[in-house]
Regions:
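Acidic, histidine-bearing metal-coordination/catalytic regions of metal-dependent phosphoesterases
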Residues: 18-148, 167-168
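Bacterial Sec-dependent N-terminal signal peptides
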Residues: 1-23
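Active-site neighborhood of divalent metal-dependent phosphoester/pyrophosphate hydrolases
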Residues: 141-194
Length: 194
């Protein structure tokens, strides 16, 4: 009888665990507000999550050769929970390239200040793919090349044409200046509009 009860409890726990939604990156990451000492990473997830960014210098070392600093999306000391994540990374050296990994932990239960239950953690896969990189601005640089794109109004063909040579030219940054869509009625339209 004890064996039967143990098996039933194990199966129930397994069923509950399997039934939990899995947190994954839905869109992004995108870099914003790049300065000489930092940058902001923005992305969305498939479910509500708590998030953070792990940063390492681009020095050829294994990403996990040492404990890497973690930067959190927080407000007055409390980690924000949601599907849209904005993590500011600061205190970096000017004109330096950094590798980063985005991480999120799914929220299974959110009762505000009473209780928050976090589920599995998931991050960008740096073992199978190269980590994302960001380079801080260098004020000592003689010149900066940037491209500005705007008034696309969901015309993907124009967008692709304007950015056709970017990979070869390697501008320091590309700025999306607005009017990427004529109107926005849904989140889906924002990400699939171009």
């Amino acid at each position: 009888m004890k064996r039967l009860i143990s098996i039933l409890v194990a199966l129930s726990a397994w069923g509950i665990a399997i039934g939990q939604p899995s947190v994954r990156i839905a869109h992004g990451p995108y870099l914003q507000q790049v300065t000489d000492d930092g940058f902001t990473v923005v992305w969305t997830t498939t479910i509500n999550a708590a998030s953070w960014v792990e940063v390492a210098p681009d020095d050829g070392s294994h990403f996990y050769a040492a404990e890497r600093p973690k930067y959190y999306d927080s407000h007055i000391g409390k980690r924000r929970i949601g599907r849209l994540h904005r993590v500011r990374v600061e205190g970096l050296a000017p004109g330096t390239t950094y590798r980063y990994r985005i991480m999120q932990q799914g929220v299974l239960c959110d009762e505000g200040n009473k209780r928050v239950v976090l589920g599995e953690s998931y991050g960008s896969d740096i073992l199978k793919h190269m980590p994302y990189t960001a380079t801080t601005l260098d004020e000592k640089k003689d010149q900066t090349e940037f491209w500005v794109v705007n008034d696309i109004h969901a015309q993907d063909s124009i967008f692709r044409l304007l950015l056709e040579g970017a990979e070869k030219a390697k501008p320091d940054f590309v700025c999306f200046n607005g009017d990427m869509l004529t109107s926005m009625e849904s989140e889906k339209q924002l990400f699939e509009g171009y």
